[in-house]
Amino acid sequence: MVPLSWSILLGVALFVIGAGGVLLRRNILIVLMSLELLLNSVNINFIAFGQYYDDFRGQIFAIFVIAITAAEVAVALGILVALVRNKSTLKVDDVTIMKG
């Protein structure tokens, strides 16, 4: 069995990489992938703590997060396709559709 500290360390490392991608990158696709990395790192920690405390609720919550993430990705990719068709760019700074 893998020690809990290794799983937490993996989750924290993935979370830091994902947060860095969300905060530092300007490409919307990279930001979306970094957000997915953030959510998957949280899932790793849910499953690790559920396994450590011998409780299945961590796995169930991780499945719910995966389902919500799949819906979020579907909506975000639809918006991304419409954005590329209208603006021909994926840069966050160039997108000013909501600006009034």
From Swiss-Prot:
Subcellular location per the Swiss-Prot or TrEMBL entry:
Cell inner membrane
Could you tell me the keywords of this UniProt record? Cell inner membrane, Cell membrane, Membrane, NAD, Plasmid, Quinone, Translocase, Transmembrane, Transmembrane helix, Transport, Ubiquinone
Record GO cellular component, one term: NADH dehydrogenase complex
User: From which domain of life does this come?
Assistant: Bacteria
Write out the function statement from the record. Answer: NDH-1 shuttles electrons from NADH, via FMN and iron-sulfur (Fe-S) centers, to quinones in the respiratory chain. The immediate electron acceptor for the enzyme in this species is believed to be ubiquinone. Couples the redox reaction to proton translocation (for every two electrons transferred, four hydrogen ions are translocated across the cytoplasmic membrane), and thus conserves the redox energy in a proton gradient.
Family per record: Belongs to the complex I subunit 4L family.
Name under which the protein is recorded: NADH-quinone oxidoreductase subunit K 2
Native source species? Sinorhizobium medicae (strain WSM419)
Which gene holds the coding sequence for this protein?
nuoK2
